[in-house]
Amino acid sequence: MASGEHSPGSGAARRPLHSAQAVDVASASNFRAFELLHLHLDLRAEFGPPGPGAGSRGLSGTAVLDLRCLEPEGAAELRLDSHPCLEVTAAALRRERPGSEEPPAEPVSFYTQPFSHYGQALCVSFPQPCRAAERLQVLLTYRVGEGPGVCWLAPEQTAGKKKPFVYTQGQAVLNRAFFPCFDTPAVKYKYSALIEVPDGFTAVMSASTWEKRGPNKFFFQMCQPIPSYLIALAIGDLVSAEVGPRSRVWAEPCLIDAAKEEYNGVIEEFLATGEKLFGPYVWGRYDLLFMPPSFPFGGMENPCLTFVTPCLLAGDRSLADVIIHEISHSWFGNLVTNANWGEFWLNEGFTMYAQRRISTILFGAAYTCLEAATGRALLRQHMDITGEENPLNKLRVKIEPGVDPDDTYNETPYEKGFCFVSYLAHLVGDQDQFDSFLKAYVHEFKFRSILADDFLDFYLEYFPELKKKRVDIIPGFEFDRWLNTPGWPPYLPDLSPGDSLMKPAEELAQLWAAEELDMKAIEAVAISPWKTYQLVYFLDKILQKSPLPPGNVKKLGDTYPSISNARNAELRLRWGQIVLKNDHQEDFWKVKEFLHNQGKQKYTLPLYHAMMGGSEVAQTLAKETFASTASQLHSNVVNYVQQIVAPKGS
């Protein structure tokens, strides 16, 4: 349903929201002046050389916006978010005329206005102002080539190395460089698209329906309203395989068998557990697209079609639970959304909590607490580096005009957000009751965008006895302090159920750090039943104790080939870091191979830091590896690695 149209049974007289008054300093648009009922994209993709000029790679076509004027006084222009890389060549306006079936679209004037380094305003002028509640249609003809929202990959950046690939990444404010829009999470709308591709290519989108129309055209429709940042497109040499009653995997042909094997049958279990906890899964399908190895992120929760790194193909299903995080966004983030990027914790803190609830049910409390302990360690690391008092270490971040919301991204909304949701559950004191509350919260605010105030008002209404106790102003734990004071969370959930997994890992790491190895004691510990996060925890402890006494790392690798020869990316990263910290040169080739196989930022940068902080041989390895892999990395990652390998001024 478009924003403003409410389905029966979803609290028909819906509460007024604090978010209705909220500003979004990251949008140049006049999104409060219009309701966006529908967007249609009709685009043709061309794979040519990069750069301007005839025949260069690009997407070209039209964007059609169906709008209703919300201004009581009417409006004389529409202002949209756009970007200098988006070349708009024509604008037309179609207005309702009494008795006319479909009035013709008439050309209208338009101009751009500077806004910030990440976008500009596109202003469409109406010859006569539109009236309050009037419906109108704006048609924009445009082309986009090189830019931050549309990522073009050469064949060598893909897994198959044969054909080029293109994908879009919208979060947080990049879709204004893909199509002109209200680029704010405050606005939700339905969309459709018709995408024309060259021979031998397939298009996929974050949409509820995917339909082939002729040999080279694909039609998509999203039946639920979503914010602009969740519209996503990918075009490449793609095939699919069913892995569940409402799920399929998409990948390049050379990856499809591995993807099917890894995810066959498991996604449905995650979805069904989420539905039991948080209510119906409203998006119809849940498909996964395995991106080319140069995709710099772990996952992006585009509805109906999550984009994920091929690093999740571990060969032993050990990283399948990473998908639980993206699935949890189906309720928290995609269904109930932060109204601006300063409230990002509403998307991510709740998603971390939901992920860990699903994980507790499927894998047990000990395992989930161990995973949460690794998350807490990341938060500690982040706060140690930035300083606790850094204003980014608040849940409610004040984003100043001109600041790209992406530049405020860090662990705080995830892990401090998780702690706040855990604290609210702790106040309730009963897990079943809090689960029921979360289901009610999703139902209350589905398809809407909210602020923390909307959520907290609802929480205190739902639990009147807590409201009566004034739990919002308990000294040291005030809701206001949680939101607006930087620093370490005032409350930490108890992770002691994880001790049964953490203690043995710590004790084993201690044995391996000894000058004289006690192989009898070491061999008495069977690590074959350990799950991934227990091994990760063990390797993190080894890394902290490194460099180990001479010969110990070689012996460690020989004793546990399942670690030193792992296919699992989380283990490969840590084994690489250990090898470099201990200058264990006979395994340096494994570091090089891992960096040749993938380009995920989270794995790539720490290994370059470790190489440049290591021996001369390690530093040479860094320079050689970068020289031979730079062409297959994402441009942002190239810039970051460049700064590590050859810092400016060195």
Curated annotation (Swiss-Prot):
Residues marked Transition state stabilizer (site):
Y414
At what positions is N-acetylalanine found? A2
Q: What class of enzyme is it?
A: hydrolase
PTM Phosphoserine: list the residues.
S7
| Catalytic residues of the enzyme | E326 (proton acceptor)
State whether keyword ATP-binding applies.
Answer: no
Report the EC number(s), separated by commas if there are several: 3.4.11.6
| UniProt subcellular location | Secreted
* SMART domains xrefs: Leuk-A4-hydro_C
Alphabetical UniProt keywords: Acetylation, Aminopeptidase, Hydrolase, Metal-binding, Metalloprotease, Phosphoprotein, Protease, Secreted, Zinc
Q: Name one GO biological process term.
A: proteolysis
Residues that the record marks as modified (N6-acetyllysine) are K446
Summarize where substrate binds, as residue positions.
G298, G299, M300, E301, N302
Role played:
Exopeptidase which selectively removes arginine and/or lysine residues from the N-terminus of several peptide substrates including Arg(0)-Leu-enkephalin, Arg(0)-Met-enkephalin and Arg(-1)-Lys(0)-somatostatin-14. Can hydrolyze leukotriene A4 (LTA-4) into leukotriene B4 (LTB-4).
Q: What is the name attached to this protein's record? A: Aminopeptidase B
